[in-house]
Amino acid sequence: AYETGSLPPATGNYDLKWETSEQIDLGIDLRMLNDRLSFGFDYYEKKTKDLIVTGITPSLIVGNTTSPMNAGNVKNSGFEFELSWRDNIKDFNYSIKGNIATLKNKVTYLHETLERIESTTSAGIGVMNYFEEGHPIWYMRGYECTGIDSQTGDPIFKDMNDDGIIGDADQTEIGSAIPDFTYGITLTAAWKGFDLTIFGSGSHGNDVFAGYNRTSRMKANTLKEFYDGRWTTAGDNAKYARSNPSNYDKYLKSS
């Protein structure tokens, strides 16, 4: 005998709501020397609450999964500085402006049933980024590499809990894509209807996932630096681990 029926794939959540943000900005602007010299300073703090997350563990009496819930908070704060000078020499006008901004990002709350949220996975790599309370948003997690074993050519991972075993408990924050600060400069010049603008910008302190030195691409080459700097013989003081196509997770490095 057969029966037909239906059931919801997940429990409903009538309390689900929009994420909200609260922000404060404090600033000072100064202009001197007939507006030729100007200076700006700002402090900002933004708190985003009730981030919508998935993967909440349901009660044992519930037989299906839970719907997305408001279960995460993030805080961003930092300073912004700007200094500029503008002047003219007869028909020639020019200006120079520089700026620098800092950013501190931190997950301040995550639902108590979640230790961390994993990002999407990549083929041959696995999970690369995590969302976890007390860390920058989507930080990089892995083993901290302290060097290359001169006898075996294998990377040496730091034993974070000093138990003599390298395992999941030794994984830690090894990087973040969020920069410590960003900066920029702009130069302008104008003369009798002609003008020129030159600008540049950059960032400092952000980490980049170095997936280009993975050895799982069996039909692709690697960069010359990794080939020349790899361990080859016992006693080598190498910068990179030995080549080993059967074990390609060592490119997930923190050094």
Predicted regions and their residues:
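Surface-exposed, extracytoplasmic segments of Gram-negative outer-membrane nutrient-acquisition systems
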Residues: 2-9, 44-71, 104-178, 186, ...
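Short loop/turn motifs that connect adjacent beta-strands in outer-membrane beta-barrel proteins
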Residues: 33-36, 88-94, 107-112, 132-135
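Outer-membrane beta-barrel signature, preferentially recognizing the C-terminal barrel domain
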Residues: 1-38, 66-89, 176-182
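Membrane-embedded beta-strands that build the outer-membrane beta-barrel scaffold
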Residues: 24-32, 37-45, 79-87, 94-102, ...
